[in-house]
Amino acid sequence: MELKQVIIAHKAGHNESKTYAERCARELEARGCKVLMGPSGIKDNPYPVFLASATEKIDLALVLGGDGTTLAAARHLSPEGIPILSVNVGGHLGFLTEPFDVFQDTQKVWDRLNQDRYAVSQRMMLAASLFEGDRRDPQMVGETYYCLNEMCIKPASIDRMPTAIIEVEVDGELIDQYQCDGLLVATPTGSTCYTSSANGPILHPGMDAIVITPICPLSLSSRPIVIPPGSSVNIWPLGDFELNTKLWTDGSLATGVWPGQRVGVWMAHRAAQFILLRESYSFYKTLRDKLQWAGARFLYDGNNKVN
């Protein structure tokens, strides 16, 4: 990878993340690389400016923060095919980030990138849009939204906690009509997030699939379902007379859903590309460490338990 132009996003409001971002910018500029840098957070979205200001192809996005900062980068940069190196600086769980200890010697990191001494993890993304009109000839309304974890169709109100009636169709066939708090349509990457909390299955991120999970359904027979990645999911919010239904992408508000509109969800045409610096990466070890599964309490040397 030749680093001619790099964007650096640091966690908004986190001093250590900003300090490391400035240090990385100086080092890359000393190597003749053009750098665009800015904060990323709830009130800060630097990516439209990054993409509009780039004078040439963006070779790398360096993200210094946690999983939330990484999700924002994936939503905006993956459709452009920009690889992401995400490092846990100020994050919490760090499911999607490289550990900070592999980023201590940053000069060595730049050398490794220039010498192509890294791996790339491809993570499936989802796309969603609003549609209205006839089922056989639907018209897209507004823009297309992307997510790395999940699309969530859920009502929101200032003064109460409304439930939803949601009808779901897959590839033109009715699946179920849920009365629930909301509905999740997730990727394998997102299966360890909101979907897992809603009693959905955990899927390996190396596979492509879509998980549909109702949130707190009133019927005990309403269960999560895993469908092929090429499936088209259509979601109709019903009986929303107070106009509360919203589409959320990775926990961020995307748009409101009006009566007569449906949400279409499908696999995005491009996957998120994450740079891996660790020489050994195990998804199962990540589950043990981050979710504190029982296996994390014991150390093994080969087949023998150490303690």
UniProtKB/Swiss-Prot annotation:
Its main location: cytoplasm. The active site is at D67. Its cofactor is a divalent metal cation. It comes from the Bacteria. NAD(+) binds at D67, G68, N149, E150, R160, D181, T192, C193, Y194, T195, S196, S197. Induction: Induced after transfer to photoheterotrophic conditions. Disruption phenotype: Insertion mutant shows a strong decrease in NADK activity compared to the wild-type. Under photoheterotrophic conditions, mutant shows a greatly reduced growth rate. Under photoautotrophic conditions, the growth curves of the wild-type parent and the mutant do not show any differences, and mutant shows a metabolic pattern similar to that of wild-type. Deficient mutant accumulates glycogen under photoheterotrophic conditions. One of its GO terms (biological process) is NAD metabolic process. It catalyses: NAD(+) + ATP = ADP + NADP(+) + H(+). GO terms for molecular function: ATP binding; metal ion binding; NAD binding; NAD+ kinase activity. It is found in: Cytoplasm. InterPro entries: ATP-NAD_kinase_N, ATP-NAD_kinase_PpnK-typ_C, NAD/diacylglycerol_kinase_sf, NADK. GO terms for cellular component: cytoplasm. Its EC number is 2.7.1.23. Pfam families: NAD_kinase (PF01513), NAD_kinase_C (PF20143). Involved in the regulation of the intracellular balance of NAD and NADP, and is a key enzyme in the biosynthesis of NADP. Catalyzes specifically the phosphorylation on 2'-hydroxyl of the adenosine moiety of NAD to yield NADP. Essential for photoheterotrophic growth. Has a significant function in the oxidative pentose phosphate (OPP) pathway for glucose catabolism under photoheterotrophic conditions. Is also involved in cellular redox homeostasis. Belongs to the NAD kinase family. NADK activity derived from sll1415 makes probably a larger contribution to total cellular NADK activity than activity derived from slr0400. Slr0400 cannot functionally replace sll1415 under photoheterotrophic conditions. This is NAD kinase 1.
